[in-house]
UniProtKB/Swiss-Prot annotation:
Designated gene of the protein: khpA
Keywords: Cytoplasm, RNA-binding
This protein's name: RNA-binding protein KhpA
Domain of life: Bacteria
Family: Belongs to the KhpA RNA-binding protein family.
Length: 80
């Protein structure tokens, strides 16, 4: 199930951004649970987050629907 979540998020994010080759999606498992980390080109960060966080919220809703409520989605700022 986790591979399906990662593939779905990667496919959607690649469709949103201007630099699809720079998209990387990782599934991190820790004692806090599972987290899908989305790494994009710094110029595309605003597109993935969306106005008022709407796109990021939609990604989180999609992940909750596919993988259950125990998976978090983090959009990683690669500038820092």
């Amino acid at each position: 199930m986790s591979a399906v979540v990662v593939d779905a998020v990667e496919h959607l994010v690649r469709g949103i951004v201007d630099n699809p080759d720079d998209v990387r999606v990782d599934l991190i498992t820790s004692r806090r649970g599972r987290t899908v980390e989305v790494h994009v080109h710094p110029d595309d960060l605003g597109k993935v987050i969306g106005r008022g966080g709407r796109t990021a919220t939609a990604l989180r809703t999609l992940v909750a629907g596919i993988g259950g409520r125990g998976i978090r989605v983090d959009v990683v700022d690669t500038d820092q």
